[in-house]
């Protein structure tokens, strides 16, 4: 497999079609699926809805938003990837209940999950902002998220705008390349448009650092819908929070689980698998991933586990041969991964390779070869 150049910055730099469900908020209008916005809320069970981006493999991604109605207010899990996304969430909540948003839980620091908070605080300034201690620490560093902390940073916003416009133009060029299959060219055209639509909605972005943190667990109690916040261990990031609704048997995982293409980049595999071990001890019937449609069984978790174990196995075997990292990447057999994750064309393979396989294999190979992992927001030793 050739080394893929998509890194975590590509995911966060800007920043599977679905129709409005029968339970969608009437305040959210029907619209095109490529306008850079979250889809209307879908009801999962009594008092619980979620919002997600259109079912495509966009690079300018938006994390899922969970809406939980308790007796005295609404708990949100994540907020979208822009101030405008947060305002959309507020409108969606207003279409479901007259209760205020009382808490916003941040599952992890990646931009597409916490940057909607300012738009929500405009309407609900007293809402609690909650995250793990590690996530709050990372969000307080402007070098990590690349946007201002506490207020917009015009210089950083210009830098991100330039990067987005450059990526959009690159995709338009790929879409015009006659050697690229037409189905893939169509995806490039749509992606180029989506990036610019997301950019249009990101002109006010900045970080609100969570004022309330936890290390292991925290309870937001309620007679009907108690919400348990959990830190089960390191996985996609060093500070992942999961949300468990025991009476509804529903778990929201943040990017610990993402479908149809998992996100991994530079995270070590062993602690991630250990976190999945902890997750599977819960008796959930519904899993809300950080991206993608809800899951009603554990088959995708099994695929995710298989992929991690196979990446690690191949990395160990190749490290024993004395291969260089570049040689190992070239010999890394991704065919079964493409098959199991449904990457059946060049477009889907691009995202699976870039968002998951390349970075995860690099990290696993370096560990197997005894190369110290570079420290960073998500990387570094276990």
Positions of PLM-derived features:
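C-terminal regulatory/interaction regions
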Residues: 35, 320-382
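Divalent-metal (often Zn2+) His-rich catalytic cores of metallo-beta-lactamase-fold enzymes
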Residues: 250, 273-327, 331
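Active-site HxH/HxHxD metal-binding segment of metal-dependent hydrolases
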Residues: 94-210, 219, 313
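Active-site neighborhood of phospho(di)ester-bond hydrolases with catalytic His/Asp-centered motifs
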Residues: 77-79, 102-110, 130-133, 232, ...
